[in-house]
């Protein structure tokens, strides 16, 4: 079978994972103690479990996941929370002192003591898989553990499991709402380290998701749980085709083949529709056409950037629920007639479709309305370079004065790493510019004839 191991690093990673496992359990009919619900037992056997869960001899399902954090608080909440019976206690690994928002602590000093223990557990989970497909790594860019330890883990996974795909879900620092001053440092250092190790990185930024929750769900003050439940829907959609059947199934390697034109340009933009509150759901038709269109509106995208300023290189549309291929093709045909959505000229077709028949599930008493179909869009667009340039300029402001650098150097980092990471990111921005520019030159040539 095609198993996936989820690795959750730091506070953001662990809290997103909580929402994800809550959702997977609902989708597969697994109770918080790991045993099946009565109606699930009565239904046809479900073979999709094994992607995310391993079955023990007595019919209990255990998630194939590892929680790792350098401080115990967040993981202790899981250990005492509603799902404490679900997870394997040895797969919850927490240290004693946190990384204090410092990449160097997560990557060099504190993280170094925990990494072997984590990799040992990863090895045990991996040995339990018959056909491991790859890893999903959840972490934030801004925190110390997420950035430092996350990067260290990615490096070591490349050494131990070179050929397996590694997909990242990264919480990118929001442009306006920062949780720490040194986020730009941590983000650029971790991007530089993981750039060559990740096959595909799905970025989400808190501010964009806050706005989606406020606008579409009518929540005045969304909390992290609201945000994470929305992210969980996206993660679930991306992996749904591995777990349920459908007419167009997509596996992890297929994403990379279709979304990543060059190894470094692997940061797709994520959008999800419909995000709608229960009060409004009854008034919406929620047709395939509408859902597909709303994915291309900047308001529904999970990183603050404007795709109308960039060009699309490739787009994956993953439908769930009551969708027939004919409707999906019609929706895409309509999209292609719109002038607002521009593709680079070296990639004329550009759409990859996936359809999975399992309708989306919602958490009971959650904010999202129950809908019979949904779509998740992953698109590789040159507009995401806006996010990088915003981050780089913040980095430059601080680094020009060498502000806060002593904290990193004090933990054994070299100052040269900062400039090296910054140059790497500048190169990444240039890569994006060149991809967009290639198509510009083509247009000028055509105009002359």
Curated annotation (Swiss-Prot):
Enzymatic reactions: GTP + H2O = GDP + phosphate + H(+)
GO BP of this protein: microtubule-based process
Annotated positions binding GTP: 11, 71, 140, 144-145, 179, 206, 228
Cofactor (UniProt): Mg(2+)
CDD domains (alphabetical): alpha_tubulin
Catalytic residues as annotated in Swiss-Prot or TrEMBL: 254
GO molecular function: GTP binding; hydrolase activity; metal ion binding; structural constituent of cytoskeleton
Entry GO CC: cytoplasm; microtubule
Sites annotated Involved in polymerization: 449
Residues that hold Mg(2+) according to the record: 71
Keyword Cell inner membrane: no
Subunit-level organization: Dimer of alpha and beta chains. A typical microtubule is a hollow water-filled tube with an outer diameter of 25 nm and an inner diameter of 15 nM. Alpha-beta heterodimers associate head-to-tail to form protofilaments running lengthwise along the microtubule wall with the beta-tubulin subunit facing the microtubule plus end conferring a structural polarity. Microtubules usually have 13 protofilaments but different protofilament numbers can be found in some organisms and specialized cells.
Family designation: Belongs to the tubulin family.
Protein's name according to its UniProt entry: Tubulin alpha chain
Originating species: Sordaria macrospora (strain ATCC MYA-333 / DSM 997 / K(L3346) / K-hell)
Gene: TUBA
């Amino acid at each position: 079978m095609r198993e996936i191991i989820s690795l959750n690093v730091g506070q953001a990673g662990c809290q997103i994972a909580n929402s994800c496992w809550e959702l997977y359990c609902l989708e597969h009919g697994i109770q918080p103690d790991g045993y099946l619900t009565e109606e699930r037992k009565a239904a046809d056997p479900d073979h999709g479990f094994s992607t995310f869960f391993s079955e023990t001899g007595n019919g209990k399902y255990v998630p194939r996941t590892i929680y790792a954090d350098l401080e115990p608080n967040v993981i202790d909440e899981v250990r005492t929370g509603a799902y404490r019976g679900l997870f394997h206690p040895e797969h919850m690994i927490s240290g004693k002192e946190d990384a204090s928002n410092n990449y160097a602590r997560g990557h060099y000093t504190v993280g170094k003591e925990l990494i072997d223990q984590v990799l040992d557990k990863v090895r045990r989970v991996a040995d339990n898989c018959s056909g491991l497909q790859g890893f999903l790594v959840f972490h934030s860019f801004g925190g110390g553990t997420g950035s430092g330890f996350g990067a260290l883990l990615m490096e070591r996974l490349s050494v131990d499991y070179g050929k397996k795909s590694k997909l990242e879900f990264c919480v990118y620092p929001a442009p306006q709402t920062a949780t720490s001053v040194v986020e730009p440092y941590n983000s650029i250092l971790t991007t530089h380290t993981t750039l060559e190790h990740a096959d595909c990185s799905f970025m989400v930024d808190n501010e964009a998701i806050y706005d989606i929750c406020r606008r579409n769900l009518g929540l005045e003050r969304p909390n992290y749980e609201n945000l994470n439940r929305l992210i969980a829907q996206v993660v679930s959609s991306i992996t749904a085709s591995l777990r349920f059947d459908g007419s167009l199934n997509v596996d992890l390697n297929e994403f990379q083949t279709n979304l990543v034109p060059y190894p470094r340009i692997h940061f797709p933009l994520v959008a999800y529709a419909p995000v709608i509150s229960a009060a409004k759901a009854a008034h919406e038709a929620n047709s395939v056409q509408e859902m597909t269109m709303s994915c291309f509106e900047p308001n529904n995208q999970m990183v603050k950037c404007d795709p109308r300023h960039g060009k699309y290189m490739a787009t994956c549309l993953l439908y769930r629920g009551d969708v027939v291929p004919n409707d999906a093709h019609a929706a895409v045909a309509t999209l292609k007639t719109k002038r607002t959505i521009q593709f680079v000229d070296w990639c004329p077709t550009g759409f990859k479709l996936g359809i999975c028949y399992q309708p989306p599930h919602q958490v009971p008493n959650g904010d999202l309305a129950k809908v019979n179909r949904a779509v998740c869009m992953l698109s590789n667009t040159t507009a995401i370079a806006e996010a990088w340039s915003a981050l780089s300029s913040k980095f430059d402001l601080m680094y020009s004065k060498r502000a806060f650098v002593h904290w990193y150097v004090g933990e054994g980092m070299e100052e040269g790493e900062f400039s090296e990471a910054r140059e790497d990111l500048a190169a990444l921005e240039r890569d994006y510019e060149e991809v967009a520019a290639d198509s510009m030159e083509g247009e000028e040539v055509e105009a002359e004839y």
